[in-house]
Amino acid sequence: MNDKFSLLKKMRRLSGILVHPTSLPSKFGVGDLGPEAYRFVDFLQEAGQHLWQTLPLGPTGGHNSPYQCFSSFAGQPLLISPELLLQEGLLAESDLSNVPAFPEEEVDFKAVQAYKEELFKKAFTRFKELPEDSELKSELALL
């Protein structure tokens, strides 16, 4: 009987929220895992919440449902933050100066994907130009 009560004492109830990162605010057409996600986590902590359930984070098919991922291992590229790529030196301020006017009421996944793919190409080109002993290349070599 004592074991049952000690187990209950060790367990604690936690509360949180279910929201996909793509639902976070972003001028890039869809929320991502950049600064806005960090602000959201800070907000959750300030609100006394402990959990953020995100839904699956994999690449999606034509209907863009997080439950229709075509890989259980890959991540959704749209969740890559252009702001963090800028912070890492892989994008320039000028790369982010002409952000399209994405709809605010719903996500235009095709437009967002086309826009972000161009940014990713620029970032990858700059990444390849980094010296082999750069800190970023060293970090990614460990993966």
Enumerate the predicted regions with their spans:
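Intrinsic disorder/low-complexity segments
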Residues: 1-2
